[in-house]
UniProtKB/Swiss-Prot annotation:
Highest rank taxon of the organism: Eukaryota
Cross-referenced InterPro entries: Ion-transport_regulator_FXYD
Name the UniProt record assigns to this protein: FXYD domain-containing ion transport regulator 11
Biological function: May modulate the activity of a sodium/potassium-transporting ATPase.
Protein species of origin: Danio rerio
Gene Ontology CC: membrane; plasma membrane
Subcellular localization, as worded in the UniProt entry: Cell membrane
Assigned keywords, A-Z: Cell membrane, Ion transport, Membrane, Signal, Transmembrane, Transmembrane helix, Transport
Length: 69
């Protein structure tokens, strides 16, 4: 519990005494869009693969099955 308290106090201390940058961060929207599209494509391909994983197995014929008498 004391470690959590120390962590919270350190976070508050750093937030209060940190200076704002003169030049704020500027996003590179083109790279962000391309990265998002790649991530989405990989995620969708993984989901489709996971859903179809057991669907494409070949059917086996059980001619020697003794339980079908």
């Amino acid at each position: 519990m004391s470690q959590l308290t120390e962590l919270v106090l350190l976070t508050v201390f750093l937030a209060l005494f940190s200076r704002a940058e003169a030049n704020p961060f500027v996003y590179n929207y083109e790279a962000l869009r391309i990265g998002g599209l790649v991530f989405t494509c990989v995620l969708v391909a993984g989901a489709v693969t996971a859903l179809c994983w057991g669907q494409c197995k070949p059917k086996r014929k059980h001619d020697d099955d003794a339980s079908k008498i």
